[in-house]
Each structure stands twice: as C-alpha cells, then as structure tokens.
C-alpha cells in the first residue's frame, strides 16, 4: 500500500506501478500524463465531465466512475469510463438494488450499509433494479412552459459544441413560460459553429 499526500496531481513523483487507486475528477484530469502508472482507478466525489471521459479513451488504465454519497458510506454503483466495457450506465455492487420514487428519483436499497431505503434527489433512467443512467438533480429541474428540462442533460449535449469554455444551463423567470432556459458561458465573446 502506498499513501500519498493530498494533491491535485497524486501521480506526480510516483515511479512504481500501482494496482488500484482512487481520485477525484480534478486529480484525474491533472494526472493524465502519468495515468499509465495505475492499473485500475475509481473516480468519485463528483461527476466526470464528458470532455475528461473523451481523454480517457486512449489510456491503458481501466477507469471507473463511482456513485455514492455520505448516506451510503461508500459507493454503491460503478460504470466503466473506457476500454471495451465503456458505458454510460451505472451498475449496482453486490447486495444493492434500486427503484424510483414518485419524482423519478433514485431510491437505494443497501441493507448492509443502511437498514432503511435511501431516497436521493438524483433523477435517473432506471434500466432495471441493478442499473441506471444518471440524468441530473431533481433540485435543478427547469420547468419551462410545463416541460421539465434537466440542465445536466442539456449541458452534456452542448459539451462538444461549446469547446474549451466553462458553461452551465440555468432557469430564468419568464412571464409566459414560468422559466426559460439560459446558457451562461465563461469568457468575453464566443463563436459557436
């Protein structure tokens, strides 16, 4: 076992091969040039953005995004981000299963971790009781003229159109729609083609 001081680039200075590691998305992004030092890596603590997933397609390290929260004490599902098993679907770990509540938010059943079902605010496309596709947060939904828009879904689709800029989708009050969708892009000017 190798313990490393907390850093935004945990692979810096590592010379030996590591069988298994864990990072946050920021650490992963900063470690891409040395990632081949790690055989298998889990990434958690935040969503891995699509541009970073693209960068992972040519690395030898098998990288998995984890899904979990404080209430589960650990991750409860994983999805492969690269390699032949790459997927956009999270799969439950052993002895864990899922369902939806009335809001279409994920409910986690992990009795070894918590005897009560854990109700989340995560909107998901539930594929079956063991797998789901994460869509976004219930708290972020924009209701525009009665249509519920999940900002995270729109942002994922725009990520290839808005290159090299940080951006987000937000709701803004509108007299006729209730809320309208607004794209906020960092920077002074932009050319979208």
Question: Where are the regions that the model predicts?
Answer:
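Gly/Ser/Thr-rich phosphate-binding loop
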Residues: 35-85
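Ser/Thr-glycine-rich phosphate-binding loops at phosphate-binding pockets of nucleotides
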Residues: 24, 68-72, 120, 144
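AMP-binding/adenylate-forming core of the ANL superfamily
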Residues: 97-125, 182
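AMP-binding/adenylate-forming
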Residues: 1-30
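AMP-binding/adenylate-forming catalytic core of the ANL superfamily
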Residues: 121-193
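Short beta-strand-to-turn element immediately C-terminal to the catalytic PLP-Schiff-base lysine
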Residues: 77-81, 101, 186
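Beta-strand->loop->alpha-helix junctions that form or flank phosphate-binding loops
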Residues: 64-71, 90-91, 170-173
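Structural motif
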Residues: 20-22, 42, 184
């Amino acid at each position: 076992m190798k313990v490393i001081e907390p850093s935004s680039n945990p692979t810096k200075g590592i010379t030996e091969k590591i069988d298994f590691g864990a990072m946050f998305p920021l650490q992963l992004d900063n470690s891409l040039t040395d990632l081949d030092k790690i055989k298998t890596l889990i990434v958690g603590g935040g969503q891995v953005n699509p541009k970073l997933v693209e960068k992972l397609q040519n690395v030898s390290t098998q990288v998995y995004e984890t899904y979990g929260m404080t209430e589960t004490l650990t991750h409860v599902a994983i999805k492969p981000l690269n390699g032949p098993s790459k997927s956009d679907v999270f799969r439950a770990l052993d002895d864990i299963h899922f369902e939806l509540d009335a809001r279409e938010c994920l409910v986690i059943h992990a009795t070894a971790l918590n005897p009560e079902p854990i109700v989340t605010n995560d909107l998901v496309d539930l594929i079956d009781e063991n797998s789901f596709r994460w869509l976004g947060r219930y708290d972020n939904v924009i209701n525009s003229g009665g249509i519920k828009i999940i900002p995270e879904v729109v942002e994922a689709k725009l990520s290839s159109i808005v290159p090299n800029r940080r951006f987000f989708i937000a709701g803004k009050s509108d007299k006729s729609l209730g809320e309208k969708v607004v794209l906020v892009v960092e920077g002074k000017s932009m050319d979208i083609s």
